[in-house]
């Protein structure tokens, strides 16, 4: 709502229900609003629902935080491959996902040249 209260959309049951509706190789993406209180608890619930296969990207310019969670086989992709795909999308559609790729790279903190979930 206007006061960033998400109610039942931020419960363990909600995240478990989202997971149950994904395919065997599903990816769940959510947006945590910039005034979201209790972000750590929300991420913990999402991580629990997805068997410790969840993460949050560093905040974007608006302050919003994107949460990702996965089911099925591990997600493991080179950051260069993500960047190449983002460049193709920008060229072909105008959709600029390069800032998202940069946030994913920051999430790795230079420890790896791959994104794994």
PLM region spans:
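Conserved PLP phosphate-binding loop immediately N-terminal to the Schiff-base lysine helix
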Residues: 37
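A short glycine-rich, Lys/Arg-flanked "PGG" loop and its adjoining helix->strand segment in the class I
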Residues: 10-24
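Short, well-ordered secondary-structure micro-motifs
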Residues: 5-7, 40-41, 67
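Ordered hydrophobic segments in well-structured contexts
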Residues: 27, 55, 66-70
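Conserved Class I S-adenosyl-L-methionine
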Residues: 14-16, 40-61
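SAM/dcSAM-binding transferase cores
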Residues: 65-117
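A short SAM/SAH-binding and catalytic strip from SAM-dependent methyltransferases
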Residues: 1-9, 32-33
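Conserved beta-strand signature within the Rossmann-like core of class I S-adenosyl-L-methionine
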Residues: 25-32
């Amino acid at each position: 709502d206007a006061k960033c209260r998400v109610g039942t959309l931020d419960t363990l049951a909600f995240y478990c229900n989202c997971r149950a509706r994904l395919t065997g190789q599903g990816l769940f993406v959510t947006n945590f609003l910039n005034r979201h209180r209790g972000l750590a608890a929300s991420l913990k619930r999402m991580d629990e629902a997805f068997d410790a296969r969840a993460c949050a990207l560093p905040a974007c310019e608006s302050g919003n935080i994107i949460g990702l969670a996965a089911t099925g086989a591990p997600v493991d992709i080179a950051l260069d491959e993500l960047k190449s795909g983002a460049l193709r999308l920008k060229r072909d559609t105008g959709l600029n996902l390069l800032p998202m790729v940069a946030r994913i790279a920051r999430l790795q903190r230079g420890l790896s040249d791959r994104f794994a979930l």
